[in-house]
UniProtKB/Swiss-Prot annotation:
Binds 2 [4Fe-4S] clusters per subunit. One cluster is coordinated with 3 cysteines and an exchangeable S-adenosyl-L-methionine. Belongs to the radical SAM superfamily. Lipoyl synthase family. Pathway: Protein modification; protein lipoylation via endogenous pathway; protein N(6)-(lipoyl)lysine from octanoyl-[acyl-carrier-protein]: step 2/2. This is Lipoyl synthase. It comes from Herminiimonas arsenicoxydans.
Length: 335
């Protein structure tokens, strides 16, 4: 990975910093300790291209409902390439606790800044929206909230409770941050309102954490997944990584082994795509045959489900990923 650690190198000067404003692109990545050096972009192979269709009526209906209830989706904030398909099918991944993250991960397109106070009406608005959309399966995720004493776990729990009250048959997957320095408290809180699927992404190989996930720790994230599983052995745990950031195939396989060693049941692997020229460069486009190899190895390792492919994202077809896993969670194999 081409990274600049020389403070004397010729990088653009940082604009005036206003922590209350949401920073995206260069305004966000210019302040990380290890600078991203622009590289010539690799041409996209045919298999990586998304088939763009005309937005459906359902697409606009969901957007209107989200805006009316002051809700945010990670689909929009992270510039997910699958947004048209998912919205068109009536599914969305809800992002709670605002749209400003306290971290500056240079692979991610979610904005950075000083988060706003929690919206006390958000759990109710979220639950009403899910009920109005008649969703059978929902994914709730969030920005990192290092400013909160519980890392936002209490807000997650309240959202789960309200959704269950209004939509008792809806299955709930949560995609959580690492609750850095607050794991004990967060697990204590989530223990009172556990989800149907617990998801926390490792994102990449540990060798690349300093560049790709500043402020995060690989072993800490694995421990979060293992400790949750110990508290809820019948609740599936899930994690995902991106490929194309500079990892090797062996590193991908080792991350998968580490997941299984920490009792992770479900896996997602997808191709990293640059949100903009200010983000980490794509170092390789992984061939479909290699994705197939990852998938085959995943099932050999004992994963209950593996969603693996170029356009796979953590929440993409999450309902299909979880189908049959949640129902048979108590019979899942564990190493």
């Amino acid at each position: 990975m081409t990274i600049d650690t020389n403070p004397e190198s010729s990088t653009p000067s940082a604009p005036a910093y206003n922590p209350s404003e949401k920073q995206k692109g260069s305004a966000k990545t210019i302040r990380i300790p290890i600078k991203v050096v622009p590289m010539e972009r690799l041409p996209k192979p045919d298999w990586i291209r998304v088939k763009a269709g005309s937005p459906s009526t359902r697409f606009y209906e969901i957007k209107d409902i989200l805006r009316a209830n002051n809700l945010v989706t990670v689909c929009e904030e992270a510039s997910c390439p699958n947004i048209g398909e998912c919205f068109g099918k009536g599914t969305a991944t809800f992002m709670i606790m605002g749209d400003k993250c306290t971290r500056r991960c240079p692979f991610c397109d979610v904005g950075h800044g000083r988060p706003d106070p929690l919206d006390v009406n958000e759990p109710e608005n979220l639950a009403k929206t899910i009920a109005a959309l008649r969703l059978n399966y929902v994914v709730i995720t969030s920005v990192d909230r290092d400013d909160l004493r519980d890392g936002g776990a209490g807000h997650f729990a309240e959202c789960i409770r309200r959704v269950r009250e209004l939509s008792p048959n809806t299955r709930i997957e949560i995609l959580v941050p690492d609750f850095r320095g607050r794991m004990d408290r967060a697990l204590e809180i989530l223990n009172l309102a556990p989800p149907d699927v617990m998801n926390h992404n490792l994102e990449t190989a540990p060798r690349l954490y300093k560049e790709a996930r500043p402020g995060s720790d690989y072993a800490y994230s694995l421990n979060l997944l293992k400790r949750f599983k110990a508290l809820h052995p019948n609740t599936p745990t899930k994690s995902g990584i991106m490929v194309g950031l500079g990892e090797t195939d062996e590193e991908v396989l080792q991350v998968m082994r580490d997941m299984r060693a920490h009792d992770v049941d479900m896996l997602t692997i997808g191709q990293y795509l640059m949100p903009s020229g200010d983000h980490l460069p794509v170092r390789r486009y992984v061939h479909p045959d290699t994705f197939k190899m990852y998938e085959e190895e995943a099932y050999k390792m004992g994963f209950a489900h593996a969603a693996v492919g170029a356009m796979v994202r953590s929440s993409y077809h999450a309902d299909q990923q979880a189908h049959g896993v949640t129902a048979g969670a108590s019979q899942l194999p564990h190493d």
